[in-house]
Every structure is written in structure tokens, then in C-alpha cells.
Amino acid sequence: MNATRAEYPLASLYIGDLHPDVTEAMLYEKFSPAGPIMSIRVCRDIATRRSLGYAYINFQQPADAERALDTMNFEVIKGRPIRIMWSQRDPGLRKSGVGNVFIKNLDDSIDNKALYDTFSAFGDILSCKVVCDEYGSRGYGFVHFETQEAANRAIQTMNGMLLNDRKVFVGHFKSRRERELEYGAKVMEFTNVYIKNFGEDMDDKRLKEIFSAFGNTLSVKVMMDNSGRSRGFGFVNYGNHEEAQKAVTEMNGKEVNGRMVYVGRAQKRIERQGELKRKFEQIKQERINRYQGVNLYVKNLDDGIDDDRLRKEFSPYGTITSTKVMTEGGHSKGFGFVCFSSPEEATKAVTEMNGRIVSTKPLYVALAQRKEERKAILTNQYMQRLATMRAMPGPLLGSFQQPANYFLPTMPQPSNRAFYSPNPVAPVRPAPQWASHQSRPPQYQPPAPLMRAVPPRRMHSNISTMKQASTQVPRVPLQSQRVANIGTQTAGARAQVNASIMRAMPHYKYSCGVRNVQPIGSSAHLQQVLEPAVLMQGQEPLTASLLAAAPLQEQKQILGERIYPLIHEMHPTLAGKITGMLLEIDNSELLHMLESPESLHSKVEEAVAVLQAHQAKESAPKSAPQSLI
């Protein structure tokens, strides 16, 4: 094994066939007796974090890795024998096929260890595996030798030998492409013919009489069920290809026993499955191409909208070939599909109908996507959101961050210090106070934005000293300092709120040389200490990346807190209802409305018109109809 050790100087081992519950700690406990370990990594799915069933272990010394490979291979961890081999970073060595041997017709009792023990006599083995499924061994496996000479010796010695009373085939490994090329050449010279759809009144003798007219038949077989009746298909094997081809040409489509029979080349199951799969994919692709760019997905439908109403709403934009509202138990599921005759008509419908309010609900209209495409897009969005959250700076003083409803005095800072928010989104947000079915009480005000403490500009003392000092500062709850209408204050009013809070606070200063903080007497100095530490989180600019960093269940809530005050300025009595209606629109369009007052005003007026029409419809029977506004 010296040559092997020189070839893999990093002493890295691949551990395969692991149980999904095996962790790095279990592997360390198992392999640490072999020698000092530098690192262990169980490979996991990037999205679900589930184990992929293999791991890598890096030893400090190649001799320790070699010892683990020799003594621990095929040992059982959590009921499964593990498989150990040298880690090969170069995929060319694995895919070249040099030294790789294929064995088939194995007995079910032969596992990885038995195969390894049998073939290790011919040379050093890089990897050894018996292919299994949920039912056990599939009867074949692979042995990858370190050299081609060892592989040749194994083939010469073991091919045709009995292994557990079964004659095994041992040969050079061939890639799937090589096998398909060889099989394709043999297919053109077929001699075996498949016949189906001749009914139950057929046996071997009669089938032979029919097909012996085309040549010498070596074998004829009608497939039977357990009761001895024909299953309606069978096989005829001819002596040469010309006779078989003549039988196919003459008999395919002819009537036998009053039935039109199919006669063709006999195929292996895997070949037939592959052909059916190709046909299915072809039909699927044709369907995708036919509906590409013309099929629309419509969601947020009112429960009263059916297929006819959906067609009526979209018919002004072009010729509709089909409409369908998806239902379950006779009730609408809230979404459906509209298919146009051309992509131009579909694009126009998306432009005009997306966001339009139909029966008190704004529609979401977009090009329909296949499940695979939608899943890929959602996965990509999730990964981008995850990367954005990881890229954002973490809390500088996170080890002793105060509760959200407490104010923490901080160290003196220059007045021009930029605001630093430890977390881009508030950790706790109150539940939404609006609903689409009822207006908000006139006296309601949006929740007060949380106040954050700004970390110091320089930190010369160690963290433990700062933590001890911070625990000595009394916490003054903001509950006693609440100010009415804090969500709609002007900049001057916010400054007065800050000043009133600071006047109520005890005076402290921070000293890195002592454990206890001391009060100071200068109120002017207090103003310099505390003013940069308070900022309304609700005034932070809301961007797409900041919104994406928030949990999905909080994103609508964040948008609602931003959009409600703007709607309240236009229609105070209907702000709650309008906010609830607009929040059903896509987040990207809501962000656009926050940036564009004209777009927001247009949507608000459209919602008001719908509400007025709805009330007028309800109050029509009354003698004195009343307006909403």
C-alpha cells in the first residue's frame, strides 16, 4: 500500500453508504482510535440539510488513514456497513474505466465485504460495491482495482467460476454509451419476434403453424396466466434475421382469430421503457411548446367567479381558447387558467389585468409556469434570500442585546455618527390590525416603531468588561414614555419625543477602566451621549433586499405598516379596508407603489370605486341609499 499512500498524500478518506442519521461526532468517535483527525465533513443537501449518505475524513498522517481503511472497512454504524475508499479529487481517474471490473449473476447473499474479500487476492482495490435496492442485492457489482494488470488477472481467473454455487460473469467495465452502441448494432440483426393481441384462443402449436410459413422457427412461446389461459402475447425465435424481418413485414397488422395483431422486434424491458419515456417526453415537449407564452395563471379569484365569468373578464384582450377555474368539492380554489390564441394577446391581458380589482379582490395574472420551473424559481429565490441574510452584518453587541421594549444608554459618540441597526428587521412585530372585511377604528394608530441602541464607535475594552458594565445600567421601560400618534409624527415631533425620553433617563457615563458606571451632572453632555443612540426603525428605507430578509409571514405585515399611513391621508375612514385589499397584491408591486405616489393613488382610487359599487349594489333595494364616503 506504499504506492497508494504516496498517491494520496493528504490522507483523505471517502466514507460511503452512511445511514442518514450518522453525524460528524459519531464518525469522530469511530475513527479517532486510528489516529489524529484534522477534519470530518458529512455532506448534506444544501436546502434540506439532510445527509447525502457519504462523508470525508482527513487524517494528519497517511499511515493513520491507511490503518483506518484496512481495519474499519465495512464496519457497521447504525445498522449499515460503511464503505471506505481513498478520496479521489480527480474525476478522470474514476471515469476512465481503467482497472474497473463488472461482475454479474451474483448470489443474493454476497455483500460488499464478501466481494471485497474474494477479489482482494488479485491486487489493491480502490472501491468495491454490490448494487442494491430496497429489496436487497440486484445481482451485480463493481470492483475498481488500482492497476489494469490486477483487473486483467481477476477477469482471467474469476470469469465463469462458481461463487456460492452460481456461475458469475466477470468482464471489463463498459460505460452506458459503449453498451448502447454495441446493442444498437445487434438490434439491426434481430431474430426474436414479439406478437400481441391474438386473444385467449391461442397456444404454442397454433402460433408455430402460423409463423413457420416465414422460415425455420427455433422456439415458439405463448405466455400463459396462472389458470393456463393465454395472456394475449408471445414470442417466435427464427434462425436468421431475414426470416424474422419477413415475418414482421407480412404479419404486422393482419387479422388472427378475428383480431388485428401487432408483430415487431422483441425488445428488452429496459429498452422498451426507454422508448416509451422518449415518446412521453416528446409529447410533453410538444404540449409545452404549444402553450408557451399563451397560457395565463390567474389567482386571488373571488369565490363567485366561475369559468364563464373568467372568460368574460379576459375576452376583451383576444381570442380565448380555454378557461378553467380550479375547484375542489364544487368550491373554487381561488385560482385558474386562461389560454389565448397568441402570445401578443396573452401579454396584453397580463399588462391590463394584473392588479385589477374584480369582485372586491385584486387579481394576480402572470404567464403559467410548469411545476418544475416554479419549483426552480422558488428555490433560487430562497437561496438568494439566504445569501442576503448571511451577507448582512450581525449584531455587534449581540451577546448582551437588550429586550426590544427597553432603552440602553451607550458610550459617548460624535454627533455625526451614522446610525447602525444591529438587525435589519425588528425581531418582534405586532399582529396586523387591519382586515379587508372591516375598516380600522378612527382612533387606531399604527404600532410604534421599536427603538434601537447604537453600538459604540470604538471598543478598546474587552467584551466581558463591557458586558459587566452594561448590566449595571438600570433599564427604563418605554411603556411609561409612550406618545400618541407616534407613527405619524413629523421630524420635529420625533425630536421632542426623544428629548422627553432622555430627560426621564438617569445620567450615566461609560468608563472602560472601572466596573461600575457613575452618574454625571451635565444635561448638555447627556444630550451628546444619548441622541445618536435613538432612531425610529419605522423610518428606515424599505428596499427589496430588506423585505426579502424578513420571514415570509412578516413581509405583508411590514408592507402594511408602511402603506397604511399613506392611505390614511387619502381616505381616513376606509384606510383599513383599502389596506387589506391592496395587501393581496404581489410584494414587488406594493414596493413600487411605495416608491411611486401616482401608482399608489391610482390603486387606492380603484379600490374606492369598487367599494362604492359594492355598497351601491347592496343598498339598491333601500329607499335612501347611502354613500360610503
Swiss-Prot record:
InterPro entries: Nucleotide-bd_a/b_plait_sf, PABP-dom, PABP_1234, PABP_HYD_C, PABP_RRM1, RBD_domain_sf, RRM2_I_PABPs, RRM_dom. GO terms for cellular component: cytoplasm; cytoplasmic stress granule; cytosol; nucleus; ribonucleoprotein complex. It is found in: Cytoplasm. Keywords: Cytoplasm, mRNA processing, Protein biosynthesis, Repeat, RNA-binding. It comes from the Eukaryota. Pfam families: MLLE, RRM_1. CDD domains: RRM1_I_PABPs, RRM2_I_PABPs, RRM3_I_PABPs, RRM4_I_PABPs. NCBIfam families: PABP-1234. Binds and protects the poly(A) tail of mRNA with or without an AU-rich element (ARE) and prevents mRNA deadenylation. Stimulates the translation of mRNAs to which it is bound during early development. Interacts with dazl in an RNA-independent manner. The C-terminus can self-associate and also interact with the C-terminus of pabpc1, independently of RNA. RRM 1 and RRM 2 interact with both eif4g1 and paip1, and the C-terminus also interacts with paip1. Prior to oocyte maturation, found in a complex with dazl and pum2 proteins and spdy1 mRNA; pum2 dissociates from the complex during maturation. Interacts with the translation termination factor sup35/erf3. Belongs to the polyadenylate-binding protein type-1 family. This is Embryonic polyadenylate-binding protein B. It comes from Xenopus laevis. The gene is epabp-b.
